[in-house]
């Protein structure tokens, strides 16, 4: 997908968690005062800086574990999205997942929730943004999955180009926070 984005004039950078353990959000709300998460780590700082520097879009990928995204990724995304929600607005985003057989749609659902609660247009493809494989290199044999990724790259590039032309965003209303009791 990065190749397709690059061919369409979109600069890409891949940020990988790898095997790093991530601190999860503890809902201390200090980020509201500090305008950043209280927990310091290299990946959070790197992503936060990219957001502050004005990245135009975001693609988040994860393997599927027990019908959900990687736990370290969710811990990082919880912190990034909660502490940086104002920097996310109107940035096109897409989720991508890989799985052996099943659980990928639940993984996509979880990842897409980060985007939809932050005023981010979700970029789609010709099918769900999934490739199949179990071992490194297996996904390269998934012709349909690879085509889906190429189309996702083209759709992301198209949306980024059209947003850059217009740059007129809807006015956001102040949030009304309720719960199920009232």
Feature-to-residue mapping (PLM):
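Conserved active-site and cofactor/substrate-binding residues in soluble primary-metabolism enzymes
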Residues: 20, 42, 71, 106, ...
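Cysteine-cluster motifs in flexible loop/terminal segments that predominantly coordinate metals
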Residues: 20-53, 177-182
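Glycine-rich phosphate/pyrophosphate-binding loop and the adjoining helix
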Residues: 121-182
């Amino acid at each position: 997908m990065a190749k397709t984005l690059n061919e369409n004039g979109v600069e890409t950078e891949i940020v990988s968690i790898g095997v790093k353990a991530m601190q999860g959000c503890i809902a201390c709300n200090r980020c509201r005062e500090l305008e950043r998460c209280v927990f310091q780590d290299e990946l959070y700082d790197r992503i936060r800086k990219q957001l502050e520097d004005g990245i135009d879009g975001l693609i988040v990928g994860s393997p599927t574990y027990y019908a959900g995204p990687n736990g370290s990724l969710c811990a990082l995304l919880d912190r990034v999205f909660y502490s940086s929600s104002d920097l996310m607005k109107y940035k096109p985003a897409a989720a991508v997942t890989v799985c052996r057989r099943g659980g990928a749609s639940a993984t996509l659902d979880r990842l897409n929730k980060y985007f939809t609660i932050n005023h981010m247009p979700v970029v789609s493809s010709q099918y769900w943004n999934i490739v199949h494989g179990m071992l490194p290199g297996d996904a390269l044999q998934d012709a349909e999955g690879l085509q889906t990724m190429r189309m996702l790259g083209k759709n992301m590039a198209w949306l980024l180009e059209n947003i850059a032309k217009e740059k007129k965003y809807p006015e956001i209303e102040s949030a009304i926070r309720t719960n199920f009791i009232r």
